[in-house]
A protein has these predicted regions:
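Low-complexity, intrinsically disordered P/S/T-rich segments
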Residues: 1-198, 226
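P-loop NTPase catalytic phosphate-binding loop
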Residues: 11, 46-52, 140-149, 167-299, ...
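Charged, low-hydrophobicity low-complexity segments
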Residues: 21-93, 290, 298-328, 447-484, ...
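Short hinge/gating elements
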Residues: 56-70, 107-113, 197-203, 247-255, ...
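Short, charged, solvent-exposed linker or helix-capping segments at domain edges/interfaces
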Residues: 158-162, 202-203, 446-450
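Conserved alpha/beta core segments of nucleic-acid transaction machinery
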Residues: 323-325, 426-523, 527-545
């Protein structure tokens, strides 16, 4: 009996070890969606920042039987399409059928001598003959075939959660990943805004354009903390982007006034120029190299000086130059989103076009990117100047072929299905890619926004939306209200015993250049010391002085 008891104990302990081992394997194998998304930020110094959980987004709803019914419908349509093509005297063979979440692609290999244009122009007639909502026909690049896209009988809803939780998004190396949706084969489509480097979006009412912009913003907010990504949101319609008010990523409140929108774009141009000057001082060409060098300089304690003119020699008349230590700080990416360009072009067309042109031509290397959207992709809104500087463009459903050609240079956007169905032309690629955008509920956006607000308050810069003439009056920070502002800065520095450009910028909500001039004046008046070898300054006077 004793040996039987021992054997029982041995078998039980062995079984217990196997259970523990299996549990450990299970823990390793299955990570929470939140952990998988956080994996992208493990190398970043954001220990205090809590990234949004994937649980804030809704799970995809799967309806049983839809795939099977769509498959049967595709088989029926294959025979029907062959008969319809024959009726229109188009010779060829349907060589492949690929079913996607929204449409099914029928690959047609036309007979020798058949012109592609003769098939493409029959798109509307083929749709009518097959009782389809619409049909899109295009050439397949690199192959002797045409793609005929016919909507499925039952349309599958694409959810943002399944895109963000996909392997494609979690393992991407993109710096600014945008989740666009799924292609016609059901594969997630992730693009990098940093490579575009700017994006032009068009689509009529009900096309899914605004929902698509929300999906793009959320995909950025899920992986980028406020110290690495700043947003300027311009929403003249006052409806679409106001939900993001007061998230810590914002540089200024959501801009709804057209004149303030002009000021915000002009401020962005000045910020771009300021960044280029700083990069020139460090001898680098782009923001990633600048940030890497700044981190190395701070770690090593090395100081970089710049020469500034402080006056003229009374005898020779030559300028007197002095060396000043640079305040070294890394630059976050800045993304400017304009939700309705048409409204701004009506009120301030020339100023808006000039600012957008300047930014789209030069801002990429400074880490500044644009997402510009409009409901009216006409030539008076999307001018040749604007379009030529946006090589990457997205078109949701538009009214007619003219609008389609205006935005993507080709016809086809007028045949889209709406509700997130889009065509994208990428920089450096000739072919159009059809994507089905994800559906994002207002409640999902609000849940993510509420979470972000708990992570901290935004540090708004009033100078972003300040009027141009007011900016000129107070740019020196030395006259009228400028003296009062300077006195406030001195009081804060003496009270807190801290002095830096960024410290003044945060507390007074002013721009970098203006804060830098205030610090320089404090140094010249003996209130703060020159920057030491690590760029820090000592406050030389007390609060009682």
């Amino acid at each position: 009996n004793f040996f039987i008891f021992l054997s029982y104990i041995f078998r039980f302990s062995k079984k217990l070890q196997l259970i523990k081992l299996e549990n450990k394997k299970t823990v390793r194998r299955f990570k929470t969606p939140k952990e998988r998304l956080k994996k992208r930020s493990l190398t970043k110094n954001n220990s205090d920042y809590d990234f949004p959980s994937i649980e804030l987004l809704e799970l995809p709803e799967k309806i049983e039987g839809i795939d099977l019914e769509n498959k049967k419908n595709a088989e029926t349509n294959t025979n029907l399409l062959a008969n319809v093509l024959s009726d229109f005297k188009i010779s060829g063979e349907i060589t492949d059928v690929k079913q996607g979440p929204i449409v099914t692609l029928f690959e047609l290999t036309p007979a020798p001598g058949t012109l592609s244009s003769s098939v493409i122009r029959l798109a509307e007639d083929i749709a009518r003959s097959m009782s389809a909502i619409s049909t899109r026909i295009s050439t397949i690049v690199g192959r002797d075939a045409l793609g005929i896209e016919i909507p499925n009988k039952h349309r599958e809803t694409v959810y943002l959660r399944e895109i963000l939780d996909s392997k494609f998004f979690r393992e991407t190396n993109d710096k600014l990943p945008l989740a666009l949706g799924k292609d016609i084969f059901g594969k997630p489509v992730i693009v990098d805004l940093a490579k575009m480097p700017h994006l032009l979006v068009a689509g009529t009412t009900g096309s899914g354009k605004s929902v698509g912009i929300n999906a793009m913003l959320l995909s950025l907010l899920y992986v980028l903390p406020p110290d690495e990504c700043k947003l300027i949101l311009i929403d003249p319609k006052m409806l679409e982007l106001s939900v993001y008010q007061d998230i810590p990523h914002l540089l200024t409140e959501v801009v709804t006034d057209p004149q303030k929108a002009v000021s915000a774009l002009k401020w962005t141009v000045k910020e771009m120029e300021s960044r280029y000057k700083m990069m020139q001082h460090l001898g680098v060409r782009e923001i990633e190299a600048f940030n890497d060098k700044v981190k190395k300089l701070i770690d090593s304690g090395e100081v970089i000086f710049k020469e500034i003119q402080v006056g003229y020699d009374p005898e020779t008349g030559k300028p007197i130059m002095e060396k000043k230590a640079l305040d070294l700080e890394t630059f976050p990416k800045i993304i400017v989103v304009v939700d309705e360009l048409a409204d701004l072009m009506i009120t301030s067309g020339r100023e808006i076009e000039g600012a957008i042109q300047r930014l789209s031509q030069m801002a990429r290397a400074a880490g500044i990117h644009l997402i510009v959207a409009t409901q009216r992709p006409s030539v008076d809104v999307i001018t040749g100047t604007i379009k030529s500087n946006f090589p990457t463009r997205i078109s949701y459903k538009v009214v007619n072929k003219i609008n389609s050609r205006t935005i993507i240079e080709k016809e086809g956007a007028e045949q889209l299905l709406g509700q997130g169905d889009l065509l994208i032309t990428m920089f450096g690629e000739e072919r159009l890619i059809r994507v089905h955008g994800p559906f994002v509920k207002t409640e999902e956006v609000q849940s993510v926004v509420d979470h972000l607000k708990k992570q901290g308050e935004p540090e708004y810069l009033n100078s972003v939306t300040i009027e141009e003439e007011d900016s000129q009056n107070i740019s020196l920070g030395l006259n009228e209200g400028g003296d009062e502002l300077y006195n406030q800065a001195v009081a804060i520095v003496c009270r807190e015993k801290k002095a830096s450009t960024s410290f003044i910028q945060r507390h007074l909500q002013i721009g970098y250049n203006r804060a830098a001039r205030i610090i320089e004046r404090m140094e010249s008046e003996g209130i703060v010391s020159p920057a030491n070898h690590v760029g820090r300054r000592e406050v030389l006077v007390g609060k009682d002085n």
